[in-house]
Amino acid sequence: MSNNILIFAIHPDDETLGCGGTLLKHKNDGDKIHWLIATHLFKDQGYSDEVIEKRNQEIKTISNLYSFDSVHQLNLKTTECDQYSMNELISRISEIINSVKPDIIYLPFKNDIHSDHRVCFDAIYACTKVFRY
């Protein structure tokens, strides 16, 4: 029986740094793997069109290399996840969880030094409560 796997990456590269080998094992085992990326780069944060396009191309490349079954993006401003309300984060993440219906979710480390990781951990962890679904 195959599983539905959801990897929650706050920034593109967190999926590989956090559990790249595990994702490849899941894929090899016939599981479906889904990638949820929390953050995105925006011009109003000082990122150039070239940097944004390079990041988008990197996401496409990694998506193809892992053969993700789906890729979802919350498009939160990188380094500014604490500017979003917890209700908004939970609502947006819950929509994706309801769509993917994962059996296993890989989360970032709760005590990571990066504030984006801590905020997003709290939001997705709240989404894993059984009574929400």
What are these regions (language model features)?
Residues 1-133:
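Active-site beta-strand->loop->alpha-helix modules in alpha/beta enzyme cores, enriched
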